[in-house]
Design a protein with these regions (language model features):
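Sec-dependent N-terminal signal peptides
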Residues: 3-13
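Bacterial Sec-dependent signal peptides at the C-terminal "C-region" and cleavage site
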Residues: 13-22
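Acidic helix-start/capping segments at beta-turn-to-alpha-helix junctions
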Residues: 99-118, 191, 196-206
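Acidic/His-rich structured neighborhood in mature extracellular/periplasmic domains
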Residues: 96, 109-160
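Catalytic cores and adjacent binding grooves of peptidoglycan-active enzymes
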Residues: 23-25, 137-244
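Envelope-exposed proteins and targeting segments
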Residues: 98-100, 123-127, 233-237
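Active-site acidic/histidine clusters and adjacent loop/turn architecture
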Residues: 35-104, 169-186, 191-192, 196
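Soluble periplasmic/extracytoplasmic beta-strand elements of cell-envelope proteins
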Residues: 103, 126-132, 196, 238-240
Length: 244
């Protein structure tokens, strides 16, 4: 937990040191957008849908934070209330198995609908999660701070960063997270409908101890993607959820 605590201290210091990223502004935005207590309703599909009474994810927690203030203040961090609840529970449960810090990326608009440039994310049941990284086999966070530009980072087919091969994807951490998301979702009567990750990275994912468990669970990880979509899912993994 020492790494997580230090990360939060640095995060809060940086927020307080700049106007747009100030903790006060984040807190005010969150407060202003959490007054709707009506139940969430997801309509349609992730690629053609809408969302009633979407709930805003807290910008940061004890071991995670949202990845970009511009995205957050633009209303792109809303979810169906059940998805929000089990996503936060999974982060809480991760504290028992890892001292890593995690980043959540784009979710849905408050009322769903098209979320450019994503093809999905339309009804509050889709989330992008930032790939956790290591450098020289230790947790590495420097690339977590670049905001929306993170979507354009490039990793090779073995999960190594194109600009520095000592930086690589932590596949064990990803598998641990997905397993705990699945467990928390099941408890709420939901399941993971689809996990999207660059196809060439699947072998690396399944080779880890938790990855073997993930494969045994039968959680669907995409079998094929278009060339463009495949190339865009090396810096993050996308998950669609659905009610059982």
């Amino acid at each position: 937990m020492k790494i997580v605590t230090l990360f939060l201290i640095v995060f809060c210091f940086n927020c307080c040191s700049s106007g747009q990223d100030s903790v006060d502004k984040i807190r005010k935005y969150y407060t202003d957008h959490t007054i709707d207590n009506l139940p969430s309703i997801s309509h349609g599909s992730v690629s053609n849908g809408s969302l009633d009474h979407g709930k805003l994810i807290p910008y940061y927690g004890s071991n995670y934070s949202y990845f970009d203030t511009t995205s957050y203040f633009s209303g792109r961090a809303f979810l169906h209330e059940d998805v929000l609840a089990f996503t936060l529970k999974a982060y809480k449960n991760l504290e028992n198995v890892s001292n890593r810090f995690y980043r959540i990326m784009e979710c849905s608009n408050q009322m769903g609908g098209k979320l450019w440039p994503h093809q999905t994310h339309q009804n509050g049941t889709s989330i992008d999660f930032m790939m956790p990284l290591t450098k020289d086999h230790k947790p590495y966070y420097n690339l977590d701070e670049i905001g929306l530009s993170h979507y354009w980072l490039s990793f090779d087919d073995n999960g190594k960063y194109s600009e520095d091969k000592s930086v690589e994807i932590d596949f064990e951490a990803i598998a641990q997270h997905i397993l705990l998301l699945n467990e928390a979702a099941n408890e709420k009567g939901w399941k993971l409908k689809k996990v999207i990750i660059k196809i060439e990275l699947k072998d690396e994912l399944y080779a880890t101890p938790s990855g073997k468990k993930l494969k045994a669970k039968g959680i669907y990880v995409v079998q094929g993607l278009s060339k463009m979509v495949n190339a865009l899912h090396d810096d993050h993994y996308h998950i669609d959820f659905t009610k059982v």
